[in-house]
Amino acid sequence: MSLSGEYLGMPVLIDDLDKDNQAFYRYCGQNELRVQECLDCRLKRLPPTSACPFCASERMEWRPVEGRGTVYSYGEVHHAIQGAFRPHLPYHLLLVELDEQKDIPNPYDGLRLQGNLAELDGSLATKETVKKVGIGTRVKVSFKQMGDEIAMPLWVIDQEAEQPTTPWRYPI
């Protein structure tokens, strides 16, 4: 059965053939960030796939992760293609390196997840918050419900973590 919801007024549909993404967004709907872990090589992976990208095994389990990490990279969007994002310009799309599995299996490898920068209430980040975030900023996952069963993982500044004095930002 397909899963459906709404994010920023836009319809979201996860087809019933896409079991891996259905599972991921259902866990998010329970306010839980889970990733696939290979039962053979024990490496975790995102996005969800039908086989391990490291050893090609099809055996996996969903494992919870803490949901804290560091901004590895980001895009600051000033021209929204989707109309629902226009009131939130500029907004950040973050690539977050989770604390789990850093530099594994090789140096500079990691478990990374994309998502929008948000406020604690689940709304997209204000311009003031966007200006505070750069590479090295510590963030944690938050969830925005999209329907009865699914939620969108978002990133908020981790107020409990030590932050860089000046996170690196792309020059504009």
Name each model feature, range by range.
Residues 32-35, 42, 49:
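Residues immediately within or flanking Cys/His clusters that coordinate Zn2+
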Residues 37-40, 54-57:
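Short, cysteine/histidine-rich loop/knuckle motifs that typically chelate Zn2+
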